[in-house]
Amino acid sequence: MTPETDFDDVVICLFDGEYHLGVAALTNSLVKYQFKGLINVGYRGGVLPLWVKQLQPLSDNYFRISDDVTIHFKQVLSNMHLGYFKPFFIKETFDDYPAAKKFYYFDADIIVQAPWMLYFNWVENGVCLCLDSAFHFIHHNHPWRKDWRALVKGRDHLLNPTFQYFNSGFLGIDRNNIILIDRWIDITNQFIKKNGQINYFIKDSHSSVRGDQDLLNAVITTSSDIEINVMGKEAMGFSLPATLMLHAIGERKPWNSSFIVHLLKYGNKPSTTDKAFLSICKYPINIFSVFRYSYKKIDLLSTCVLGRFLG
C-alpha cells in the first residue's frame, strides 16, 4: 500500500488549537468500530499535535494508526473559518485521492458510536446527512430558504421542497455526488461576493446565514437532483438512544470541561458524549497524560455521583 493512493474510504476532518484532542478521540473511535482506510486531517498552525509522536511515521506527514488505518496531516493556509473551509478541503481530498470512492467528513468534536459497515452501507444510497438539534424543521417557504435561493442562480428548476434542516458536522458522500461539493463551494463564493463574513460565525440568531451549515442547507434547498439519505436527531445523539455518533455541540467540550464545576455552577450533569469521550481516550492514541486522564476520570465519576444526589 502506498499512503498516497490505495484507499477506498477516506475520513476527512479539520482542526485548529485544542481541537486536536477531538481528532484523536475521533480516530480512536474509528479504530474501535472497524474503520479501514485513510483519515485526512487539515490543520491550522505549524506544529502537529504532540500525540503524533506515538504513531509510526510513514512519509510526508503520513502516520500509521493501526494495520488498517493511516492518518495524514495537511496544513491549511486559508484564513477563512474552518467551517466555511469545509467544502474546499473536501474537494481537495477528492482531488488528492482519485482512487478513493467514499468520503466521510466529521467535525473534530464527533466520535463514532456504530460499526463502520453501517456508514459504508449508508453512503450506498445517497448523500448522508443528519438532522440538526435545534432547527431540524424549517418550512420550505421559510424566509431563510428564500434568502438562500437568492444566493443561487440558474437552479430554480431544482428547488427542493424539503422541510428538513441538516447539521454540517457530518457528511457522507461518494465520488458520483461530487457536484454537491462543487455547489457548496460555489455558493460560499457567492456569499463572499455579497460581502458575507467567512472569518467567523455570526451570532445573530435572526440571520439566514450564520455559518457553513446554512450554506450547506442552501445547496440542499436548490438541489432536488441530488439524492440525500437522511437520519434524524438520534444519529448525532441529539436525542437518545444515539445510533451512529455523538456530537459535542456548544463551546463546552469533553476535553476542556471541569465536570464538577459545570454541575455546581450551571446544574449540568456529564452528558452521554462526555462519558463516551473519556472511554476512548487511551487506545490506540493516549490522548492525555496518566495524571490528567486520572484527574478527568475522578472528576467525571464524582460528578456523576453528586449529580444523583442533587437530582
Question: In which residue ranges do the predicted regions lie?
Answer:
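Conserved catalytic core of nucleotide-sugar-dependent glycosyltransferases
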Residues: 118-187
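Residues that flank catalytic or metal-binding motifs in active/ligand-binding sites
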Residues: 86, 106, 166-167, 212, ...
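A glycosyltransferase accessory/donor-loop signature
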Residues: 1-7, 158-161, 178-311
